[in-house]
Amino acid sequence: MPCPHNEITIVQRSQRQSAVAAAAYQSGEKLFCEYDQQVKHYPEKRGIVHNEILLPANAPPEYADRNTLWNAAEAVEKQWNSQLARRWVLTIPREIPPDQYAALVRDFCNQQFVSKGMCVDFAIHDKGDGNPHAHVMLTMRAMDERGKWLPKSRKVYELDKNGERIKLPSGRWKSHKEDTVDWNDRKYGEIWRHEWEVIQNRYLEANNRPERVDLRSYERQGLDIIPTVHEGAAVRQMEKRGIQTNIGNLNREIKAANSLMKSIRQLIKNLKGWIAELSEKRNELLAQKAAEEAVFLPNLLMKYERIDEDKTRHISIEIHF
């Protein structure tokens, strides 16, 4: 069955993170970070079968180079706590042929991100362990028609009922900040999850596969199931070598609890079925008894009337004689 896991995170400078380092990790390439003047390289990373950059029409052509793109994205961010990139890990259904993985992710990214003005850097990871997935990085800023990064927010002056600016006691004009783009709006998490579900199912259907992906939470699906905790590659490798981990143990307990709850729900379902059958049988017996009584009482009355008539006739004969 397709696995519904997907995870969105933000690369943050306040967490000592680097967009260049993240790009080097997912692509398998050696990149130089101009911000800290260090080479980012992860030679131990295996299973990278494809990487690709997608650009909107107004992006500078040189951003097709990974090193140039992410150093430019970092250079425009001046704050110590700047958000540098958005990252998404997408599980790819094993039921889709491997030669379609890149097309699947490319179609999704073009539809949902490039069309809105984001630069996209994605890579397909598949070590042949049954866990194919994609790493997707997205730029955080929009660009103007000349390919220049736009501010993340702009000052908007508040107006009174006459359309005039409102002056504060300090002499300044009353204002507030508005985001240039709304990509950080929480609604997009739901929208993108849904669209990823839709395109996966379209590829599954095109390959005549019966499986379907449902990225709604168990609660939204109406399922009384405890979700397991995402293990990650390191935990899976340790578990594969026979080393029990805290996360692995927790997931085993969750699966055991779900199995027990499933058995209890099935038992309750069976009991409800038996109760319904007994109730139906009782109703049948009551209906049968009512039908028998409906026939019995008129017959009894008829017999009584005949007996009464015979008795009356007999008394009449005796009086006559």
Predicted regions and their residues:
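N-terminal nicking endonuclease/strand-transfer module with a His-rich metal-binding environment
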Residues: 1-321
